[in-house]
Amino acid sequence: MSDVEKASLPPAIFIMGPTASGKTALAMALREYLPVELISVDSALIYKGMDIGTAKPNAEELALAPHRLIDILDPAESYSAADFCRDALREMAEITAAGRIPLLVGGTMLYFKALLEGLSPLPPADAAVRQRIEEQAKEVGWEAMHRQLSEIDPVAAIRIHPNDPQRLSRALEVFFVSGNTLTELTKTSGDALPYQVHQFAIAPATRELLHQRIEQRFHQMLAADFEREARLLFARQDLHTDMPSIRCVGYRQMWSYLSGEIDYDEMVYRGICATRQLAKRQMTWLRGWDDVCWLDSEKPTEALDKVIEVVSA
């Protein structure tokens, strides 16, 4: 698409960044200066009852700056990048029709990429095929299923960990249903996003600063009674660590603690380490991102001014 064609499209803003980088604060501040409506791009914030461990904006913040696509699912439900694209496009169209600018804020980079580039049409879920895969996994184990995927689709097998049964079974299911591998089907993207997108990434200037912010926020979550929140979920007995909700950083480690597998101090240590690993993956995505304007989270006023300047140009 040419620059002239892009300029004729309605505007949208992406604010991306690693966890604990100040994305939400920047997005909320922008509401005072630009006619924006916020859409959350976060695979953890979609879940109801998972507030403290996800650093979800609190009730007061949401009253001041409502976020769409927050609290839309029960933790027992799953949500795909395709689901996100469908919902986000609907919300963006509604915001644009009202004469305002959709501002998408979050750290789930796969969602941003899927929305920006479009998704290849994959075969719909097939319950019977999925059941056969899960039954086979019970017999031989997920390690063996991963070896099977390595023979069918070695590229996908490199990306998918043997301890990720949801993604592993989906990759196998796609092949058994369509006869094509997940890698083959995702080589071609779908329709590009019909918006002029202004893309920003916010992060501290150094890794050390980001690590400090992550550790500080994890301890703040614990002080806000994250353990009690996790215990309420644990007590339901219909949730487990194979589910995307409980695989979220912090919750997975809290689950191990509540199960008696590790003690409290080990849970805290692992939770902080897992959050740092998440931030590292997010930064890896962003360093390879095209057309992104970097902002320093330690200089919030300058970051705010830069976004306003770029969007208003």
UniProtKB/Swiss-Prot annotation:
GO terms for molecular function: ATP binding; tRNA dimethylallyltransferase activity. Residues 42-45, 166-170, 247-252 are annotated as: Interaction with substrate tRNA. It is an enzyme of class 2 (transferase). Its cofactor is Mg(2+). Keywords: ATP-binding, Magnesium, Nucleotide-binding, Transferase, tRNA processing. Pfam families: IPPT. Its EC number is 2.5.1.75. Substrate binds at T19, A20, S21, G22, K23, T24. It catalyses: adenosine(37) in tRNA + dimethylallyl diphosphate = N(6)-dimethylallyladenosine(37) in tRNA + diphosphate. It comes from the Bacteria. Catalyzes the transfer of a dimethylallyl group onto the adenine at position 37 in tRNAs that read codons beginning with uridine, leading to the formation of N6-(dimethylallyl)adenosine (i(6)A). Belongs to the IPP transferase family. Monomer. This is tRNA dimethylallyltransferase. It comes from Pectobacterium carotovorum subsp. carotovorum (strain PC1). The lineage of its organism: Bacteria, Pseudomonadati, Pseudomonadota, Gammaproteobacteria, Enterobacterales. The gene is miaA.
